């Protein structure tokens, strides 16, 4: 069990404890007063809706040795035990991350920590990095949207990026399991809320930046400024930190000049002759098929033929960013190009639904599940599928409730532009009226004759598969790997992949 003197943690924030507290042993840290037990230091984290500091008295009653809260929480509570409930003025979330990291003995310093941020592509890239590193014989931990896992342990993730108390504890567990590398999906929320405070990154990837989370960030500039923080101290190491940037993205290209020579730029659009930079990685001779893409991948020193078993140019970009960062970490390009050929992909990312009877499946439409839930994500997926589709392209999608409303008509317009028919339905409506979300999407659509809408997602998927014929492709977008639907305060079982597979199986029996 981890144990540390309380005064060592308080020294980080300049708090001098009372004589009664100075030698107290702390064996746990928590942001949750209900998880507190004897030996715990409770940190009252301010939240979007509730200030966790208000629960400090409950935490002490539950056995916490001490609690640290902000001055705002103190004003609301009034009288407190000043010896055991300690108050700091500001920057709580950053300070709390440092305290937790110190408690767990700075685990990121014992790992080669790679962060992946961006609007789209994070999960595919982190899965690919984990896959390649494990194939290269490296013990690797993965933290992200789908799973948190390391040698001997795996759990379903509750957040894309955990809060600092959980994250640092899990990083320490990965160290204890002798992990050498850790791959971390880094959301914009986690940067803004300092969940990654205390993490020191060996390397970082910026995938792309397109409209999302504008219900949280005031505008795209604010969204960008939040993301860019990952690429500078105290997060990315100052001198030796490696950054890989998608040069084809206009927002990200702004960042390269700030990073000077420490960044590697990656492009699927332009070639070396158009760009002079010793850290430039690019592709030529691109070809795209139903099974993936091939290209010649160029580094500043060598080139190699590459097959990426993922559909679409956006996935080619994902792949070469992953390969570039491992190449910069001194792995062999030849080994990487060989190993990527067998990468199975990430769940719910351009995932083709298979049924048992292969002979019958040839007479059925292709059904693809993808997590695309932003305008740019949906556009790139549809553009990639459109190039390969021999028949009709049929799209099923919705937009999440209690989230950025401005993207709804944009996604409606994109679905209409690239699809032959669109089924608009529900996608985690949460507390919003599902029909109102559909109406918002319809605001972006001109030709209503191409549109069918049904707020019942099962019915929409069922009708889309019935509607589709051989050589058609049905894209079911928005939920990807998710196995639930959020309706008001209820969470019900709902898995696009299982439902689509069952409906395809039923359709096959009628053939």
From Swiss-Prot:
Any one Gene Ontology BP term: cell wall organization
Name of protein: UDP-N-acetylmuramoyl-L-alanyl-D-glutamate--2,6-diaminopimelate ligase
Taxonomic path: Bacteria, Bacillati, Cyanobacteriota, Cyanophyceae, Synechococcales
The species this protein was found in: Prochlorococcus marinus subsp. pastoris (strain CCMP1986 / NIES-2087 / MED4)
Residues that span the membrane, as ranges: none
Magnesium listed as a keyword: yes
Pathway note: Cell wall biogenesis; peptidoglycan biosynthesis
Gene Ontology molecular functions: ATP binding; magnesium ion binding; tetrahydrofolylpolyglutamate synthase activity; UDP-N-acetylmuramoylalanyl-D-glutamate-2,6-diaminopimelate ligase activity
Cofactor: Mg(2+)
Main localisation: cytoplasm
Top EC class of this enzyme: ligase
Catalytic activity, EC: 6.3.2.13
UniProt-listed Pfam families: Mur_ligase, Mur_ligase_C, Mur_ligase_M
Catalytic activity: UDP-N-acetyl-alpha-D-muramoyl-L-alanyl-D-glutamate + meso-2,6-diaminopimelate + ATP = UDP-N-acetyl-alpha-D-muramoyl-L-alanyl-gamma-D-glutamyl-meso-2,6-diaminopimelate + ADP + phosphate + H(+)
Post-translational modification: Carboxylation is probably crucial for Mg(2+) binding and, consequently, for the gamma-phosphate positioning of ATP.
Protein's cellular compartments: Cytoplasm
Residues carrying N6-carboxylysine: 227
